[in-house]
């Protein structure tokens, strides 16, 4: 009997930021994984149960940070064709951290950087990641809080 293959692979993206100073965390993937800069991201696993649970797990796995505060659902998702023939659908979230601490990188990444918002937008490799960050920045700016 073969395994079931669903048409979508659900994924999450976590835009981590600090308010003072205003910084955005970006991670650089290993060359084998594309070598590009992006926020924390990964697949939703069956054990997660919810997108927020997947965000918290991925952040812990990729940075060593335990998210204690609330997550912000950016009400933004995007999709792209995966190499496995499925469509990968990414749901974007954000979380504020108290300060720009050095992450403990997983073996998926080679570098990290806490960048000002404008530099983060220029550094992100993928347009969909830039769109998600722009959404966070616009939302926070309209509230008069958070990264600008």
What is each PLM-predicted segment?
Residues 1-25:
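Conserved N-terminal beta-strand and adjoining loop/helix that marks the start
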Residues 16, 92-96, 114:
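Short, well-ordered beta-strand micro-motif
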Residues 22-62:
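Conserved Nudix-box catalytic region and its N-terminal flanking loop in Nudix hydrolases
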Residues 38, 87, 114:
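Short aromatic/basic micro-patch
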Residues 60, 64-101:
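Active-site segment of metal-dependent pyrophosphate-handling enzymes
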Residues 103-136:
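NUDIX/MutT-family hydrolases
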């Amino acid at each position: 009997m073969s395994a079931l293959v669903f048409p979508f692979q659900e994924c999450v993206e976590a835009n981590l930021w600090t308010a003072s100073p205003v910084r955005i965390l970006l991670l650089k993937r290993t060359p084998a994984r594309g070598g590009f800069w992006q926020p924390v991201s990964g697949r939703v696993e069956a054990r997660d149960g919810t997108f927020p649970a997947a965000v918290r797990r991925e952040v812990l796995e990729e940075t060593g940070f335990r998210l204690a505060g609330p997550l912000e659902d950016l009400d933004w998702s995007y999709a792209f064709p995966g190499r496995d023939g499925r469509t990968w659908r990414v749901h974007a979230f954000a979380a504020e951290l108290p300060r720009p601490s050095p992450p403990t990188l997983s073996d998926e990444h080679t570098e990290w950087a806490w960048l000002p918002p404008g530099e983060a937008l220029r550094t992100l490799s993928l347009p969909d990641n830039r769109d998600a960050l722009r959404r966070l920045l616009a939302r926070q700016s309209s509230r008069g809080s958070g990264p600008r």
